[in-house]
Structures are given as C-alpha cells and as structure tokens.
Amino acid sequence: MNQPTSRSGLTTFTVIIIGLLALFLLIGGIWLATLGGSIYYIIAGVLLLIVAWQLYKRASTALWFYAALMLGTIIWSVWEVGTDFWALAPRLDILGILGLWLLVPAVTRGINNLGSSKVALSSTLAIAIVLMVYSIFNDPQEINGEIKTPQPETAQAVPGVAESDWPAYGRTQAGVRYSPLKQINDQNVKDLKVAWTLRTGDLKTDNDSGETTNQVTPIKIGNNMFICTAHQQLIAIDPATGKEKWRFDPKLKTDKSFQHLTCRGVMYYDANNTTEFATSLQSKKSSSTQCPRKVFVPVNDGRLVAVNADTGKACTDFGQNGQVNLQEFMPYAYPGGYNPTSPGIVTGSTVVIAGSVTDNYSNKEPSGVIRGYDVNTGKLLWVFDTGAADPNAMPGEGTTFVHNSPNAWAPLAYDAKLDIVYVPTGVGTPDIWGGDRTELKERYANSMLAINASTGKLVWNFQTTHHDLWDMDVPSQPSLADIKNKAGQTVPAIYVLTKTGNAFVLDRRNGQPIVPVTEKPVPQTVKRGPQTKGEFYSKTQPFSDLNLAPQDKLTDKDMWGATMLDQLMCRVSFKRLNYDGIYTPPSENGTLVFPGNLGVFEWGGMSVNPDRQVAVMNPIGLPFVSRLIPADPNRAQTAKGAGTEQGVQPMYGVPYGVEISAFLSPLGLPCKQPAWGYVAGVDLKTHEVVWKKRIGTIRDSLPNLFQLPAVKIGVPGLGGSISTAGNVMFVGATQDNYLRAFNVTNGKKLWEARLPAGGQATPMTYEINGKQYVVIMAGGHGSFGTKMGDYLVAYALPDNK
C-alpha cells in the first residue's frame, strides 16, 4: 500500500538534488560568463533543470536529456583538458555519480518506456569510465624520455672530499648534492630498510613561530655526523649506529614573531684539509690549537657559533667565547629580524655567512649584508653590504649597515679553485611594494653575486628579476659543474635556480650566459581595480631557455576543485583576479601570482651528476594571491611580526599592507589543477628536460580530518633531491610523508618508505664500515602543514643483500 508513496519520495528527493545542482550551476555559470568565462555551466544548469522537470513529470525524456548532458560534458572536458585524469575528475565526478543514481530502478520506478533512454545514459557513462581509465595511463603532463649518457665507471675526484663522506650541505660546497657511492643502486634500492632512527627531543613549543621547521641536511666526516635542530642545538652522531655522542645548545630564545625558526645545515672546518683549500690558504692569517676542527652553527637570533668538532665545547678563541654577534652594526636590530637560517661556506681562511630579513613587516628592517670572518679568530675581515654605495665599506664607531638592503637567505656555494663564493640574493623588504626603492637597493637584488671569498670584492653579478614585486628571490643554493658547451669545450658553469622557474646557466668565471637569456616584455598595468599608487615597473624581465615553469598562461580551463561546484567557484575567483601571466603587477583588487611565493624552485635546489652530465630536481607549481591593502605609511607599528610569511602583513612605512595566501578553493584545495609537484631529469649536454613525473599523493593532504588514499597526484614539496652513481635519485619534500627513490635514467619510481613525520628536508648519503646509508630528517614543517616530529631516519640494505 505504501510503495507508491515511497517511490514518490525517492523521486522527489532526486528532483530536489538535481534542481539545486542546476540552480547552483546556472547562477554560478551566469556569474562566470559575465566575467568572460566558459558558458558551459549555464548550458549544464539549463539541461539539469529540464532533467529535474521531466523527472518530476515521470517522463522518460529525463534520461535522454541527462545522456545528452553527459555526452556534451565529456566532449567539452576533453576539449578543455585532454586526457588528464585529475583535470577530468571534477568535470565528471558529480555528473557521473548522479547518472549512475538515475539508473537505479527505484529512482525511475513508475516511468514508462525507459529502455532506450537507459541504454543511452548507460552508454555515455561507459564512455566516461573508459575515458577516465585511459587517462590514468596517458598523462599529458608527464614527459617519458630516457637519458642516454651512461654512468662512467670512475667518478671524478673532489679535492679534500672522501667518496664515503658528505662534509657540506650540498655534499661539496659546490652544491652538487651528488655522491659517487653505488652500493645502493637502481637494482637493489627496493630492498632498503630502516637501519637506525635518532629522536632529537627538540620539538616545537607553544612559544615558537608558526614557521617552525626541520629542514636540516646532516653532514658526515669520517666517524662523525653533525646535525642542527630547529632550535639550533648541534648534535654529534655516530653514523654507523645513530647514537648521540654529544650535544651543544646555543640557548636560542625565540618568540612567535620569528618569521623563521629553522636550521638547514652547518659548516665544517678542518685545518688539515689543505687539499680542498689550496687557493684560499694563501690568505690565511691565523690558526687555532684549541679548535683545529670545528663546526659552525648559524643561530636564528643573529649569532654565528663555533664548536669543537671533537669535544662539543665552544671554541672560545673564536669571537667572544665561541660566537660572533651578527647583530653588531645592524640598523633596527631586534631578535629574529636578521635571521641566519642556511649554512654559509668555509674556506682555508674565512667563514662567509648571510641571513634572512623579516619580509613585509616594515621598511625599517636590518641589513642583508654578507660578511666574511676569520675562520679561527672570528675577526670581521670584510663586508658586502648589498644596499651601500660602497658595498665593502667596513663599519665603524657610530655607523651601521644600510637598512633593508637585499638579503641572502639561501645556502651559499663556493668554488675552491677560483676562491669565489656565490651568493643568491632576494629583494629588500617590503617585497610587494617598491615605489621608494633606490637604485642602490635594487642594484644587487634578486641576483647571483660572485664575490672573492678572501677579500669580499665583487667579481660579477647577474640579476634574475628586475624591480621584484612578487617575492621572486633566488632561493636555492647554486650548483657548480663543469659542462661541455656546443663547441665541445669544457666550461665552468653555475646553475642559478629561481622561484620563477628560470634556470640560468652562466659561466661562473664571469657571469656570461651559457644557455641563452632573453629580455621579454611583461605586464605594466592591471585590468581590475585601481593602479598601485607610487609604483613603477620594469618593462622587461630576463627569461632563460632552460625553464621548468609552465610556459602557457593560466586560463579558467586550468582551474580545479574536488567537484564541478568548487571548480566553478575557482573559475569565478580566477576571473575576478588580475592576471596576465607571470609578473602581473600587484593590486588592490588582488593579483594571481604564478609561479607563486613558494616558487618553482625553493631552497632545496637541484642535484648535479658531473660524471654523467645530468641533473635531477623537484620543481613545484602552486599559485598564490597577493592583495594590496591601502594604509597610512606613517601609521604606528601596533602589530608584532606574524611569525609567518602568509596572511596579512603590515608593510609599515609604505602606503600599503598586503595579504598573501595560496590560491585555494572553498574546500581548501588548490584552485589550479594538479600536478603541483614533479621530479624531472635534465641532460646537461643539451639542457633538455628529458623526463618529468608527478610526485606525491593526497594521502596526508587533510591531516586534521582523515587519511586519504595514496593516489599519485603531484603534490608540492619543500626540500631538495640528491643523486648517486648507482643511478638513483632520492627525494622527500612532499606533503605526504614519504622518502622516495627514482631511476635517474627515466624517472621511474623504484622505492618509497613511509616517514614518521614530514620530510621537508634534503636527504644525504654516506658510507661507513663498508655500508652505504641514506639519511633524512623527518621533522615536519609548520606552515606547510605536515606532521611535526624529531626523527632522523637512516636507511641501508640488509646485511645479506
């Protein structure tokens, strides 16, 4: 007796759902169309309204109209994005599920003549399923080439560096992140197991910055490994067992206003290593009987600490009781304002250090000066102040360095033969408005500086972005490699990776491009909202022929979501923003910044195999939005530092504040379709990207809600890669907690291991007692949202392998 009522209720429910979906698509589609976007959503909304009405009337034409909608959507989807599974998914998921629902007999019970209409709908759904399955195996974003150059039997020797060691942040101070070890290779890497785990005990506290991160790459020399923790505790470790030998605590005092709380690495000095430092030893002025072997630790409150590498005691003959005050002669000095987060370099005579400066807080911040200190006494030998008329002018009584001069926060690199330190710089803060910048403060911004490490004199400089308004720093340690040019001559090259995706390949002797660089016109105005007051723009920007950024401008076709609903909202949001490609000016309306603030390349850099003339890297692509907020430049400084680079930043002293955020959907997912992270292999003989693969899954993308399936999508990563003579690339970095190994020849994934916390660090490898190990810090990243921890994890082959 009640069955017809039940049927009516189920049908009514379906009609309501389809009707609501139709109204959402129709209203949103009209909004999008008025902004110049696709009219598909209007058409889909109208067809769904017809389906709802026909279903309400119990007419079989409801399924015919739905089949037409499905077929049209399939054709439209392929036209927009081809056979990209993740791009197709939000276009087809809701409609596909709803189509299957309409085939349930209980939903259409009481409707006559359904035979042919069900066949039509079933056919379109089958086409959609076949398309999705096909797209899984035919990813248009991936490049599936193969590097032909074989690995030589013998590796090039590096003076002063044992094959079994990893004595510097990038293994060598040339920043190559390549090891000649090959016990672990592409055939047996699948057998790696955890060999040991060390827990440092140094965890984020309630008083720490939101940007607390664990990004350290350990160094290993002989029988000692050294790491620094997030609070810059220096720990000496037995590399064979993972047992702690000793610990030195610099007693860092932090608060939540620190924009960064991290230590990416330390520097090692051995007075007996005369082979590596033959050139710079000519400038040596001192020695130390107390600390002939020492480890230098950059401390976030503005100190450089020297510790005896054998005993763990402070080198009291260095500076003042083992440390130099990097805040000395600093203008507007305050804890965390000038913040060394990355390792510098050491030579036979000098330790060179730079640091970050708080971004976007005010126009009265510390200097980004680069300094060279006597490696034994800590005496200030030279300065290079990037904002001064005379960068080498030494500070004196009553004088300070130039405030807000461009800083160098990334790791430095060093050519021991040329005695040149290579310094990647950013822009003088505030980053997003530069109307008051002087020519002097822009001269060395966003550049690669080649500086004589013994004298501090500039050898050459190359600017990668002019008048930067997008935070497009040079963020990576440069990599030095001798490569063959087109004439077959060996050229000493430097690879300068940038946030823009440009990889500038220069002769490291003189800064001249090896791979062509072209100045191209860039946008000068915005189309929505007022033009920025008091601002000016560079008419052109440099572009390298080697570029890992997407080469096409984003369009609303590239917008994404978990469903067609949030995808529609992302398309609307995209159309409402100012965007005319890379270098679109910031605006009050809001500007899409792509590549975004994280950049295509970050501090992880790339790995260069000089023996094989190949490089591997892990570029990312995640759009951001910057929105200028008009403000009185003379307003009082009422807010403390936010402890992060995102959100609202006050930019005191200039006529705007700024809000910076990732470009996300209403569900908190990126509005740009995946992939957001890749691994790639480049042939350095041709500078061709030979292979490129998505990396990372959505497993940990919603860590506070639930764990998602480990489906490869290509997620962002922070941290670098390494490679070995065993034809293996190792990389962590991604938002899911894994360490992975890839085949350097073709990019095939060979192995992965689940990490106990986020692996936003660059791994390293070494050998001891005849066994090769791979080590990564799994400690998480505050603003990146990965699981925090304190784990140093080592992997090795089982003894029977």
From Swiss-Prot:
Subcellular location: Cell inner membrane
E.C. numbers: 1.1.99.35
Signal peptide location: 1-33
Cited InterPro entries: PQQ_b-propeller_rpt, PQQ_mDH, PQQ_rpt_dom, Quinoprotein_ADH-like_sf, Quinoprotein_DH_CS
CDD domains membership: PQQ_mGDH
Catalytically driven reaction(s): D-glucose + A = D-glucono-1,5-lactone + AH2
Membrane topology: Multi-pass membrane protein
UniProt KW Transmembrane keyword: yes
GO cellular component, one term: outer membrane-bounded periplasmic space
GO molecular function, one term: quinone binding
Family according to the record: Belongs to the bacterial PQQ dehydrogenase family.
Other remarks in the entry: Acinetobacter calcoaceticus contains two different PQQ dependent enzymes with GDH activity. GDH-A prefers 2-deoxyglucose as substrate, the specific substrates for GDH-B are disaccharides.
Record's subunit section: Monomer.
Functional description taken from the UniProt entry: Catalyzes an exceptionally high rate of oxidation of a wide range of aldose sugars, including D-glucose, galactose, arabinose and xylose, and also the disaccharides lactose, cellobiose and maltose.
Database matches in NCBIfam families: PQQ_membr_DH (TIGR03074)
Protein's name in the database: Quinoprotein glucose dehydrogenase A
Species of origin: Acinetobacter calcoaceticus
The gene coding this protein: gdhA
